[in-house]
């Protein structure tokens, strides 16, 4: 059984650095080099613990540290935090998520890689192939309760299984706010780790269950609410929080419920506070703007879906859980509750659960973890392609190293499926397994194995008759089978407004009635051709953006797979269009849109002024010169905002060019003594 540590007390300050006592104890434990499974409430300070142990490990051994988070928004947030801590050091920060980052070339330089589970899994496979896995000295898995998740869990399990199998000396840190006891103990035993658990929260939390007009605490009536026009009492609960200077998150069952709740609240809020909506109908930039407005206090109430609790750290004084889906887990409810109370701003926070509208499932404290078919298939292909698995004995060792209770049957079934589908081959003479070219390509991508065959079939059709002057066919190839929400236009309506090249591309696609994939493909094609899409397709900006993100992931993966099987020309075409989907622009402005704070519209304006590359921006000579150009473009934006944008662009360009130079000189090792942030 794994050793267990527990922290119950509060705050400790030593050597000029404020740390909670549980943080001090956990950091001291982590500095011994042992792997640790940490459970601590939201806002307890897990990230600070992670950073201290990580930096100690890099200072002690040097090498590469993986920071794995389940969502791109969390990766963005963590990257910014880590970047601040690395100021003045020689440690490199690499972002591998959301279309950013590629292979790591300079393994001699100390590096922190922030990545999603899928990219971390891909990175580790490449490291094993290159015999560089021993360079990975630290790996943190944040939100580790998601090891059981059907989508992200497989990649997380794959990372840890391969670290065990390649006999890596990497120290592992798994962190969660909602991991249950038996699962935590089983995970620690599997990894040879110790557990560290604390219930300490820097902000006191009060949890109420609302039934009718009464709030209960542990089945005991605590308070009766008044009635009036506010039938559900949401306005009353919101108003009293705003009057105390606080903010409110209202979790709703659906996107429609978010909108209707916000509309109902607006006339009932007694102050001039703004009410916002946060759901997948918004574009990512609109969601970021809403989050920033909430943090700044210009928006005091957000009506949101449960995804906000998972994808972004946005605490509030009060959390109201008005409704959730029937299949919502109690772990997700805990994530929502954990948003109550803002450390450093509130002395306490409270969460109110509407019992009559919240039917969620109670997850049993079960130590069993299952391996899904797709995850098992990827694990088999990756371990064979990387050379970890060669013989039948190695297959058994893979099973022994896996976490899932059903690993034996899943792995054997996956080996059979991979062989039947041409991903791996058995050599009767040497009695060894090897990956085919297709299997190697799949291993180097993040693609689901079951998608490879149908996508290659589509590519072969594309090769027989592609309209090279239009991107529509390639985009249609990339759009997933199940895409977005309902569409309000038919493909035939859209064809009537198309240019000649796109009409021919549509003819070769074979337009079918009610083909949502085609509608989304046309929308995305209009975006990269810089045409207006407003109100044209009857779908939300958020749905179009999600379709674009799915196309980008598929496009990046297909480039890798196509290169591996000799379809280099196809890979080049798909790669160019994928890059345009990332930027939302024509090829002429592609390089500019890779710069942070420069979107497609701003890139087009700069290009008209002869600025087409990062070097052109730097050659302007000053922030003031760039500000003058931006001011001509943005007449309705204040000078202060534009100066900040110009400064941010200049800083980003300098950083990009430095990193570009470092990539070119991969073999040059940074000389002199390493510099590290001070750690207590």
Predicted regions and their residues:
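Helicase-associated low-complexity/disordered flanking segments
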Residues: 1-28, 32-36, 204, 259, ...
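Walker A/P-loop NTP-binding motif
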Residues: 28-35, 47-61, 161-163
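Conserved Walker A/P-loop ATP-binding site and its immediately adjacent core
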Residues: 47-48, 63-84, 121, 177-183, ...
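SF2 helicase catalytic motif II
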Residues: 118-121, 128-172
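Conserved interdomain linker/interface between the two RecA-like ATPase lobes of SF2 helicase motors
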Residues: 161, 173, 177-263, 358
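A short beta-strand element within the Helicase C-terminal
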Residues: 301-324, 350-353
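Conserved segment of the helicase C-terminal RecA-like domain
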Residues: 323-362
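C-terminal helical accessory/scaffold domains
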Residues: 382, 390, 404-407, 411-425, ...
